[in-house]
């Protein structure tokens, strides 16, 4: 199913040594690379889908894999809002059953903590054995985790299931985002990475539908149905894995030119295009090697890579700081505490996920037109205002204010997914240098999950009625962190929309200031005499 690590006689044979690719083909490779870059810029979204339908299809598969991660993440938070789950695993407190804060923290924190390990491990493993085999190993872990969650009757067994399921969750995200960044044509790259975020709304949407139908039951199937349904979602993904072509970028980097050619052919490129694409990949990797040698995690922090690492990692960390963990995990529980019936809160959960999906779909049409920087920056401004108003209404505490808080949390889901919820994944896959993309993605996701782990342990003690009982007033904390995040974005976030990896390499090596990225004329543009506006940059 995968590829071994033994280099073969390369395609073409004269460039078998991957460290001498650029030298062996010389100016010919560079000319082909620049020409293909210009062709990519001229291609529209619909042309890319029509000419490379299989590349588009396998990007969709990588997006589908992300549904597994969002499904399990949402299931862990949603079960807290199911009365029967609190009864089976919790204790009686002031007229209702409450899950102990320590176990609530453990259920939320354990899978996020193991996802950190999964993300970092996947970055290393994916570079050693390939993207496809890393997927395969992750599927084994996810099935074990689902089984333990389903059969559990004690907090300890359920905790074990959540812990094990966290490892593939981290791995799936790392590999999927890396694979999309490597396989998607330039015209589709922004849309596909933004569309990847919709997977993080589809999973919760499915969970909400299941809970709406079964959550009011008075037996264990009120919550077990959620986990059983995961078998279908995961099983379908595992079935299609056997047909997935390996990443041509990974194959070229390993010196497997013939296999890279076959992979590109399976992705929909004809014979002429295959040779051109291999030249582009080889040129890009060779130019990166001129700047640095090795592909260790430490390399992410050296020379121009450090700046790229920070810019790649920061948006995902900002996601974890701006309150999405609280909104995604505690909205249903908060609605019940605020006086809504379980059935009403389950219906509101469906509305929440529909708004999240609509927000992400909206981002597809804005991410290239508005640009990554603009959409992220102004989105954070809106989220900051929403969080501060939400906290203020929670302080008021009147019935009308409580309803207003619930409404604002729904609006938050839409705005978040239009902006930082979508752009963070585009920036992660686009900004990282080619040879370090998997490791950069691993670090970004590990840091994000570390922050989520912190919130998982802290929020129950701030939020729960038997603890600090802050409720939605925790929005003030996230609002303050959002202010700091917005300031960072204003000064340090560059615009990368419409830029090829070759152009980004050039601009980072030249240390172009962040706010000058949009207007900078690259050597590729100069050589082809194409103005910046002709390259499809965001206006």
Describe every region a protein language model picked out.
Residues 2-269, 286-539:
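Alpha-helical transmembrane bundle of multi-pass membrane proteins
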Residues 271-286:
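Short, well-structured alpha-helical segments
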């Amino acid at each position: 199913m995968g590829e071994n690590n033994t280099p073969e006689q390369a395609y073409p044979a004269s460039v078998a040594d991957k460290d001498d690719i650029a030298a062996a083909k010389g100016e010919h490779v560079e000319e082909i690379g620049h020409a293909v870059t210009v062709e990519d810029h001229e291609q529209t979204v619909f042309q890319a889908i029509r000419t490379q339908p299989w590349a588009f299809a396998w990007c969709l598969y990588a997006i589908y894999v992300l549904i597994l991660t969002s499904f399990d993440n949402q299931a862990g938070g949603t079960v807290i809002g199911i009365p029967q789950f609190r009864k089976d695993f919790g204790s009686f407190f002031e007229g209702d059953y409450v899950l102990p804060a320590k176990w609530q923290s453990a259920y939320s924190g354990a899978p996020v903590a193991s996802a950190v390990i999964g993300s970092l491990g996947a970055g290393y493993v994916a570079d050693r054995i390939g993207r496809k085999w890393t997927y395969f190993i992750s599927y084994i872990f996810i099935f074990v985790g689902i089984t333990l969650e389903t059969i559990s009757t004690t907090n300890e067994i359920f905790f074990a299931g959540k812990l094990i399921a966290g490892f593939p969750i981290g791995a799936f995200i790392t590999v999927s985002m890396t694979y999309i960044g490597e396989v998607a044509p330039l015209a589709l790259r922004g849309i596909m990475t933004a569309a990847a975020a919709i997977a993080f709304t589809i999973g919760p949407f499915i969970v909400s539908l299941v809970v709406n139908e079964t959550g009011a039951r008075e037996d264990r199937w009120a919550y077990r149905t959620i986990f059983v349904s995961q078998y279908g979602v995961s099983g379908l993904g595992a079935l299609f894995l056997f047909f997935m072509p390996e990443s041509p970028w990974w194959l070229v980097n390993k010196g497997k030119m013939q296999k890279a050619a076959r992979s590109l052919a399976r992705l929909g490129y004809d014979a002429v295009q295959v040779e051109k694409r291999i030249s582009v990949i080889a040129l890009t990797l060779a130019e990166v090697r001129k700047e640095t040698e090795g592909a260790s995690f430490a390399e992410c922090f050296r020379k121009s890579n450090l700046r790229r690492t920070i810019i790649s990692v920061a948006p995902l960390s900002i996601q974890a700081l701006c309150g999405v963990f609280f909104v995604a995990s505690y909205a249903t529980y908060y609605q019940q505490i605020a006086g809504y019936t379980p059935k009403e809160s389950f219906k509101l959960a469906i509305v929440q996920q529909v708004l999240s999906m609509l927000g992400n779909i909206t981002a597809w049409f804005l991410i290239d037109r508005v640009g990554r920087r603009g959409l992220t920056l102004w989105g954070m401004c809106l989220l900051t205002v929403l969080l501060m108003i939400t906290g203020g209404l929670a302080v008021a505490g009147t019935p009308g204010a409580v309803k207003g808080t619930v409404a604002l949390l729904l609006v938050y889901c839409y705005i978040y997914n239009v902006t930082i919820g979508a752009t963070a994944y585009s920036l992660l896959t686009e900004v990282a240098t080619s040879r370090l993309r998997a490791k950069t993605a691993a670090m970004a996701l590990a840091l994000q999950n570390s922050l989520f782990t912190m919130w998982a342990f802290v929020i129950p003690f701030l939020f729960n009625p038997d603890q600090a009982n802050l409720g939605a007033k925790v929005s003030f904390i996230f609002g303050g962190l959002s202010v700091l995040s917005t300031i960072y974005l204003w000064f340090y976030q560059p615009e990368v929309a419409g830029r090829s990896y070759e152009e980004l390499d050039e601009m980072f090596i030249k240390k172009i200031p962040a706010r000058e990225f949009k207007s900078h004329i690259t050597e590729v543009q100069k050589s082809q005499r194409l103005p910046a506006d002709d390259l499809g940059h965001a206006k």
